[in-house]
Amino acid sequence: MLDAWLLIRRALALAALAEACRMAYAFRMHAIDDYGSVIHEFDPWFHFRATEYLVQNGWHAFFHWFDHASWYPLGRPVATTIYPAMHITAAAIHASLNACGLAWTLEDVCCFVPVWGG
């Protein structure tokens, strides 16, 4: 009998976890569902621009990029002032989707990366 209760508790815990994941995904998709793949805020615009720079100019240029358009008038050395994992991930996903024949724009990928990342 104890094993049955343990199985029920685990099933309920798994169901609660699955529902929490579904709700978190739906919450992150809300803006995309309502307004489409549009970048709304400043930080996502910077991250999109940084990812675009990585895709267009490659690794070496990205890690030596001094961005004069941010932190005006001083600018900023991008590679030493950000965590580049999101940009690298978005660039890799964009390249993978294009290699598979799926024509996703970089902006679309950058809109969905936070949803997929949680």
Please annotate each region the language model reported.
Residues 1-31, 42:
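Start-transfer (signal-anchor) and selected internal transmembrane alpha helices
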Residues 27-118:
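Active-site lumenal/periplasmic loops and adjacent helix-entry segments of GT-C-fold
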